[in-house]
């Protein structure tokens, strides 16, 4: 596996651990719809949380969250709409959707994790 793929996988594992510590229930990881992949789908109370994980080895070229581009946001919206339709019987009618980013960067020998809630709006 390429080094950047290993870093991305590690970042997703760290993000999932972080979310679980914050009492999120992980519903899916790497959920794919057509050409879109959602890194983590989680639930906290009546909120379906769509999490994009961005991991960087350094901040030399910008913060991890700066690399979530409009095209990716559009793909996430399509994917989460499909996911809700697919799992609609599993959710309460008043389920809310929130899009978060978990930004991770290497900080020496450890990793810094920043959880950005409501990172962008879907409607």
UniProtKB/Swiss-Prot annotation:
GO molecular function list: nucleic acid binding
Pfam families: UPF0102
CDD domains: PoNe_Nuclease
InterPro entries for the chain: Restrct_endonuc-II-like (IPR011335), tRNA_endonuc-like_dom_sf (IPR011856), UPF0102_YraN-like (IPR003509)
Family: Belongs to the UPF0102 family.
NCBIfam families xrefs: PRK12497.1-3
Entry-linked HAMAP family: UPF0102
Name used for this protein in its record: UPF0102 protein Fjoh_1217
Species of origin: Flavobacterium johnsoniae (strain ATCC 17061 / DSM 2064 / JCM 8514 / BCRC 14874 / CCUG 350202 / NBRC 14942 / NCIMB 11054 / UW101) (Cytophaga johnsonae)
């Amino acid at each position: 596996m390429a080094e950047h793929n290993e870093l991305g996988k590690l970042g997703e594992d760290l993000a999932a651990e972080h979310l679980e510590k914050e009492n999120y229930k992980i519903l899916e990881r790497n959920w794919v719809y057509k050409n879109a992949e959602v890194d983590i789908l989680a639930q906290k109370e009546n909120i379906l949380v769509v999490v994009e994980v961005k991991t960087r080895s350094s901040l030399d070229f910008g913060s991890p969250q700066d690399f979530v581009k409009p095209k990716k946001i559009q793909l996430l919206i399509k994917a989460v709409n499909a996911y809700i339709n697919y799992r609609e019987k599993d959710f309460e009618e008043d389920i809310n959707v929130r899009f978060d980013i978990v930004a991770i960067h290497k900080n020496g020998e450890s990793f810094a994790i920043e959880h950005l809630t409501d990172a962008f709006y879907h409607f």
